[in-house]
């Protein structure tokens, strides 16, 4: 019951409260930049997609922490979720600075990620960790793509995405070291297809 209450609290905080980072944003020490209308529009769309990714990460990690019976794994998942909360706060702060907003479909993204996390975790802890590894690897690749697309002048957004990308790689390595099983190719393809739908939609809505 306590775990379910923690998950419910996480959902409410993720979707309806202003996220509070435990660590200052990498963009905070950088000066404000003057972007053109087109540059601002592109940065806003990309950071909105990144914010959606962090909403999904909260749903995924919370679902998995609810199911596992391994206290150490639960602790590790919750620690990763706290780091993802930093990312959530940083991307939200950057959206605010750009004069933009999060995706209107965040409740849908959170619910979908939570459901997928529950299914993966019920198979086994190793399968659950395998899902984490594949998710973090895909997110890392996606963030690398955003670094190539973000305007060179948008140093604050680039600093945030660069730090997030390094954190996601570390999360994948930690899950792999904890005993993750590799996902079968069909599962990886399905995840990529679902991510494509999410990123394309969040880019606009």
UniProtKB/Swiss-Prot annotation:
<comment type="pathway">
    <text>Cofactor biosynthesis; ubiquinone biosynthesis.</text>
</comment>
<keyword id="KW-0408">Iron</keyword>
<keyword id="KW-1003">Cell membrane</keyword>
<feature type="binding site">
    <location>
        <position position="168"/>
    </location>
    <ligand>
        <name>Fe cation 2</name>
    </ligand>
</feature>
<dbReference type="GO" id="GO:0046872">
    <property type="term" value="F:metal ion binding"/>
</dbReference>
<dbReference type="InterPro" id="IPR012347">
    <property type="entry name" value="Ferritin-like"/>
</dbReference>
<comment type="similarity">
    <text>Belongs to the COQ7 family.</text>
</comment>
<feature type="binding site">
    <location>
        <position position="171"/>
    </location>
    <ligand>
        <name>Fe cation 2</name>
    </ligand>
</feature>
<feature type="binding site">
    <location>
        <position position="54"/>
    </location>
    <ligand>
        <name>Fe cation 1</name>
    </ligand>
</feature>
<dbReference type="GO" id="GO:0006744">
    <property type="term" value="P:ubiquinone biosynthetic process"/>
</dbReference>
<comment type="function">
    <text>Catalyzes the hydroxylation of 2-nonaprenyl-3-methyl-6-methoxy-1,4-benzoquinol during ubiquinone biosynthesis.</text>
</comment>
<keyword id="KW-0503">Monooxygenase</keyword>
<keyword id="KW-0560">Oxidoreductase</keyword>
<feature type="binding site">
    <location>
        <position position="87"/>
    </location>
    <ligand>
        <name>Fe cation 1</name>
    </ligand>
</feature>
<dbReference type="InterPro" id="IPR009078">
    <property type="entry name" value="Ferritin-like_SF"/>
</dbReference>
<feature type="binding site">
    <location>
        <position position="84"/>
    </location>
    <ligand>
        <name>Fe cation 2</name>
    </ligand>
</feature>
<feature type="binding site">
    <location>
        <position position="84"/>
    </location>
    <ligand>
        <name>Fe cation 1</name>
    </ligand>
</feature>
<dbReference type="InterPro" id="IPR047809">
    <property type="entry name" value="COQ7_proteobact"/>
</dbReference>
<keyword id="KW-0479">Metal-binding</keyword>
<dbReference type="Pfam" id="PF03232">
    <property type="entry name" value="COQ7"/>
</dbReference>
<feature type="binding site">
    <location>
        <position position="168"/>
    </location>
    <ligand>
        <name>Fe cation 1</name>
    </ligand>
</feature>
<feature type="binding site">
    <location>
        <position position="136"/>
    </location>
    <ligand>
        <name>Fe cation 2</name>
    </ligand>
</feature>
<keyword id="KW-0831">Ubiquinone biosynthesis</keyword>
<keyword id="KW-0472">Membrane</keyword>
<dbReference type="InterPro" id="IPR011566">
    <property type="entry name" value="Ubq_synth_Coq7"/>
</dbReference>
<dbReference type="GO" id="GO:0008682">
    <property type="term" value="F:3-demethoxyubiquinol 3-hydroxylase activity"/>
</dbReference>
<dbReference type="GO" id="GO:0005886">
    <property type="term" value="C:plasma membrane"/>
</dbReference>
<protein>
    <recommendedName>
        <fullName>3-demethoxyubiquinol 3-hydroxylase</fullName>
        <ecNumber>1.14.99.60</ecNumber>
    </recommendedName>
</protein>
